[in-house]
């Protein structure tokens, strides 16, 4: 299946409307988990990012692969920053019994 056909399939089948990228990333950075990127599809005008098997859909103008890579890096940073593993690393658990 070509990416254009995949994009059209996602656009028709996913129940929710696309979310605003800036609002989504701002909210997720502040509130926590952003979900896993499960699919990417593109046509000649837009790139669609599907998170958590369709629970969130982000559409952005198709400009370049650099934009796709930067969005994916941002999603990774949010996920790492808000995971319990990352927050455990930030805790100061050293003993201060002196």
Curated annotation (Swiss-Prot):
Output the superkingdom of the source species: Viruses
The cross-references to InterPro entries, in alphabetical order and at most eight, read: DUF5500
One Pfam family linked to the record: DUF5500
Which organism was this protein described from? Answer: Human cytomegalovirus (strain Merlin)
Name the gene behind this protein: UL19
As for family, the record states: Belongs to the HHV-5 UL19 protein family.
Protein name (record): Uncharacterized protein UL19
